Regions:
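A fold-level detector for beta-propeller and closely related beta-sheet-rich head/sensor domains
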Residues: 1-145
Length: 145
């Protein structure tokens, strides 16, 4: 979403959602689920943050990562969260606040010593936010039961 889609006050000129996460069945080509992703918590008109986690679905600016265990991780919205979704339903099942926004796709690795799987995200700042940083954050996935 560039300025051509915004009013002079910086407000989008179309109705929400402005960004969604979608799952498509690759065999049938049918949409399985679609959910708005992102809030206006860290954005607002005239560059003033709203500080309200209203889930309107914000423009998405990064890649997602799905795991074999049925989790989909995504951080590329204009608020400062890494989210995990259930790949079967699209339900947001976890989120954590990042120090600044991220337009990075999450990465994963498994420790060769412990066998534990980690999700890593780079957070350097989100478009339309003056906040910048230089963070690499790792989260450990729960052990398999």
């Amino acid at each position: 979403m560039r300025e051509r889609f915004l009013s002079p006050l910086g407000i989008p000129c179309q109705k929400p959602p402005f960004g969604t996460m979608s799952a498509v069945d690759l065999k049938s080509g049918k949409l399985v689920w679609q959910v708005p992703v992102g809030t206006v918590e860290d954005t607002g008109p005239l560059g003033i943050r709203m500080h309200m986690p209203i889930p309107v679905g914000m423009p998405t600016l990064g890649a997602s990562l799905s795991t074999q265990s049925g989790l989909l991780f995504f951080a590329g919205t204009q608020d400062f969260y890494l989210r995990a979704f259930d790949t079967a339903t699209g339900k947001e099942i976890w989120k954590d606040r990042l120090p600044v926004g991220s337009q990075s796709g999450p990465m994963t690795y498994v420790s060769p010593k412990t066998g534990k799987q980690y999700i890593i995200i780079n957070a350097g700042g989100a478009r339309q936010s003056p906040d910048r940083g230089d963070y690499v954050i790792a989260y450990a996935l729960p052990d398999k039961k």
